[in-house]
């Protein structure tokens, strides 16, 4: 399975959320293979300790980039980048979430989102809402899942 290098991960997070968080500082040191390249697929395997760090990093990214109560211009800019007033522009939360998630997943996966991926993400949103999460909390839950997906 292909994964991002630490630098690629941090840069992708910066591009997605518009903030530089450097969450990979707590990741295990990357090994450089005989090729001399950091991004050689021969050395970028996924250790269990690294997977745990990815899960923690996804939570950290969502918490720091999209806090429940934004207090800085950077927070408001990031929220605008992700949520984009879709809830006001669409007739239902499900339509709004589908629009927000389609845009985010396309950027996160660096390719067009498939119909099945969007359906699955929207279903996760609906389940989150059914479990008592707010609109934004349910969106953030799906975003966190996307950040640990092999497609990311």
What are the residue ranges of the model-derived segments?
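Low-complexity, glycine/serine/threonine/alanine-rich intrinsically disordered linker
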Residues: 1-152
